[in-house]
């Protein structure tokens, strides 16, 4: 099989990857805009652990951010990872994004500190980063190895985010993304390897 770095075969495919990555990455931006509309803001909440009255926050917390700096930091990382994901794992793109969107919130709801609210897209970012990283380790293929190295280079410090080192940071969301990204990489490594066979020296 002929291979290039991102499995991009033509300009149209690349533009589609940019478009779909933009579609997902822009959701937190819309969420941030809606946060500044008083009649809507009260319904935009994060995850409140074990609070059944606000369990819908599991679905909303990736689009809710504390301030512009928090938003831009997450959106930039998210956009880069989404482009890598779409280029190399297109058949599984939305399945991976959906898992990364929901599972960290469920994890926070189950194990997070009560009487706290967790917000931000970092759980999804961690899911994508560790999914891409582990696939590169599991499948001996130049594209995936290269993308693992990109993740290490850009987000190597992410590993420390899964530990409770900073009280203002939702480490539970990071840990949830790490766990879900790792599990999904294990589950999808076999079908992905069939799409892109291991290369021989």
Could you tell me what each predicted segment is?
Residues 2-201:
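A detector for small-residue-rich transmembrane helices and their helix-helix packing motifs
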